[in-house]
Amino acid sequence: MKWWEKMKNSVAKPEETKRLKSWKTKYENAKAKYSDCLDTMRLYDSYYEGSHAIRKDNMEARKKATSVWNIVYELIESQVSSSIPMPKVTPVHEEDVELARRIEQFLTQAITRLDLKGLNDLQERTTPIQGASFMQVEWDSNKGTHCTDGDLSVSTVEPEQLIPQPGVDKIENMDYYFIRSSQTKAYVKRRWKKDVSKEEETDKEIRVEADSEDLVTVITAYFKNDEGGIGLYRWCGDVELEYLEDYEARFVDACTTCVDEDGSPVLMENGVCPVCGKKHSKRVKDEMDTITTYAEVEMGTTVDGRPFTKETAVEIKLPYYKPSEYPIVIRKNISKKKSLLGCSDVEVIADQAEEVKKLNTKIDEKLLKAGSYVTLPEGKGVETTDEEMKIIRIETPAEKALIDVITLQADTTQDRIFMESSYNHAKSALGITDAFQGKYDASARSGTAKQYSINQAAGRLESKRVMKNRAFADLYKKMFKFALAYADQPIPINILGEGGQQTFSHFDKADFIKTDASGAYYWNDEFYFDIDETSTLQTDRAAMWNQNDIKLQSGAFGPIGQTDTMHLYWTEQARNCYPNAGEILRQVDEKLAREREQQMQMQQSQMIQGGMPNEMPSM
């Protein structure tokens, strides 16, 4: 933007210009103090991508490796897990058990709906490379179904996109943080109705390396406001895009002049004020939520004195629910004190990766420079023709004795031993064994020993699994809070019943309204969010089917061949979604009903034939 355009804007909107200048200063200061960490991120990425650069004493690359054995990529990929930790919700109050079950099912269905599997697949790489990764929860009003307005949105935020407040190592303790993203100028125009055609891209390092004049850098600042809520400020270059002092509040269009009897602004209807008919509006905060519920209201008494009730619609007004916390979740690799990010796997094995590159290059040079050499008498040569037989012209038998071939073969034994040692050192540092990688393990001479070796490696990696579970538990908590705040229509969910049948219900925020001891309404968000440790087996349906087969054969369901036994078995199979299990269970139930009916008929016939037990004997 030209200097005279900046001057024009500063005169026209002094408050906006002052605010923009203040936030840009904070951003530049935070970015400068975070620059070393950003440089380290790019270095770690280069290791994973198999960079040929050979560094010396943490300095710039001075040499290129001829080939790369990418142990960083290999060891990180060995740890990738595609499993998604499933939510476990525990209510604080006994009467909220059913609500907790609905929350669990709502979150479980959101995993597929929001493609959290794809997000997890990306973070399984990013987290060990950079030491941490981030997930952002938002409410997207443009999503939803025919019957719902909006839906949750969960996206990944790359570590290099986030600029933290200097000196603070926990997100929840920060007064503010920044997220930078690359957007097209057309997208900015569509979403925020601001022209940024004259702005330039300032942070090109956060995207793929491809020059484009259509891209700009959008900076978003999240901050804590004076009321304890969350605010948002967004800009692009020298253009303010959005400023929300209360980011989580709701705003509506109201008339600039008209007010109600209680002094509140009159809301616009279809862009027109219903009082004065003008179209001039302003954005005002919508404080109160109106929820319609149904309650049994006593209408009187019947003739016999019993109370007569009727289900009547009741309108409840209470302040809109707000999450009041940052919409971002951090997933650390390994905890590291005095650091926002965790400990990176690349940081741990970088020295070994450099050694492997150097030794691999040294071995290549030795092998490529080795070869065979011919000794000839002085002054003699070999004809260089395409003929099969080459002619060497000699004069005496003594000259023939001087013709020889010398083969020079390099010894790379020690180099290979050293390189293998560096590789094993890297694996040991990360706690990865050959058995864990699925390779041949000479130390494991039986299946039990091999499983023990795998379990040992899994134990070394337990901390990473705990941090992953913690991050997803925090994610599920924020997803619930955002749904409670912004899901104005009930969201359909289906719940698997005890008999394997599906029952359909809704996640309705009206169900989370309670009254305290004084009779005041409040939003019930008193639930504990954790991860179901048994979810891996429960989500592996084939494993559950096999477990049921084993239990059937062992007699856990009862004697094999009896209908009661088959009823229990197929009930469990239906609960675990075995194909056609519901139809088979129905047929088993019909057979069981017929057998019980036959038994009753036989008992009745026996009683008739044998007489009544207390019948008097005939004289």
What are these regions (language model features)?
Residues 275-276, 308, 319-328:
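Hydrophobic/aromatic interaction determinants used to assemble and anchor large protein complexes
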Residues 93-100, 317-320, 334-338, 352-354, ...:
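A broad, low-specificity signal for short, low-complexity segments enriched in glycine/proline
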Residues 326, 333-335, 342-355, 359:
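Solvent-exposed, non-transmembrane regions of membrane-associated proteins
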Residues 340-351, 410-418:
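Short alpha-helix boundary/capping segments
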Residues 129, 156, 215, 322-325, ...:
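A short, structural micro-pattern
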Residues 56, 62-68, 83, 321, ...:
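Terpene synthase/cyclase
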Residues 1-57, 127, 135, 141-147, ...:
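C-terminal anchoring/interaction modules
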Residues 1-291, 297-303, 313, 414, ...:
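Extended, helix-rich architectural segments
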